[in-house]
Design a protein with these regions (language model features):
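ABC family nucleotide-binding domain
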Residues: 9-221
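H-loop (His-switch) and adjacent beta-strand-loop-beta switch element
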Residues: 218-230
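ABC-family P-loop ATPase nucleotide-binding domain
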Residues: 1-19, 227-232
Length: 232
């Protein structure tokens, strides 16, 4: 059995396998992954399409249960938690920023950040939402709806939504994929700055080698395996 994660390791995974598709002939998308990630570090996941990057993120973030192996996140064995307990564990520990912004069009920027926290029973949800939106440079857009915001501004709202609950772990899956080069650089500057201010561990999925080199560690996947693990 995997030893409990130490204070220095926010993620500890051993023998993680994920099989998807037909039970009679499943597709192995992760093949015995062993991985530890230090608390407060920044890690890039590289690899071609189909290499297992998004699947690994899904397992590490609790969105998907591993077929075999063990994943400890902040000392908790996600595989041993029932659905409700897993949802509670993820809520306080994990933030996710995706390529698609996934903002609700009928809610203002503030509401898009605050309402998920409010539904989770968080105190001062709207005050925290406003503070985080100020921090990402959107203090003048608090009452704007997504349709009134540029792509870069919408991604800033998504970053604020992910960081406002103060997660220990922040996952970003191709967060600049829908943005032009200049806006993408600005958003990544912001993402790195805000995660550092929050003390969160950052795991970024990207095809962009330049973005990967901004992280402290680069892990390359191929065919469901880690094929390279190096300092940036």
């Amino acid at each position: 059995m995997l030893a409990p994660a130490t204070n220095d390791m926010v993620i500890a995974a051993r023998g993680v396998t994920l099989a998807l598709g037909d039970a009679a002939a499943p597709t192995q998308v992760l093949r015995g992954i062993d991985l530890e990630i230090a608390r407060g570090s920044s890690v890039a996941l590289l690899g071609p399409s189909g290499s297992g990057k998004s699947s690994l993120m899904a397992v590490l973030s609790g969105l998907e249960q591993a077929t075999a192996g063990q994943v400890l996140v902040d000392g908790l064995d996600f595989g041993r938690l029932d659905e409700d307990a897993l949802a509670r564990a993820r809520r306080g520990r994990i933030g996710i920023v995706l390529q698609a912004f996934h903002l609700l069009p009928t809610m203002t920027a503030t509401e898009n950040v605050a309402v998920p926290m409010e539904l989770a029973g968080e105190r001062d949800a709207f005050a925290r939402a406003r503070a985080e939106l100020e921090a990402v440079g959107l203090g003048h857009r608090l009452t704007h709806y997504p349709a009134q915001l540029s792509g870069g501004e919408q991604q800033r709202v998504a970053i604020a939504r992910a960081l406002a609950p103060r997660p220990a772990l922040l996952f970003a899956d191709e967060p600049t994929g829908n943005l032009d080069a200049r806006t993408g650089t600005e958003v990544m500057d912001l993402l790195f700055a805000r995660r550092e201010a929050a003390g969160a561990t950052l795991i970024v999925i990207t095809h962009d080698a330049r973005l990967a080199e901004r992280c402290e560690r680069v892990i390359t996947l191929g065919d469901g395996l880690i094929v390279e693990d190096r300092a940036a």
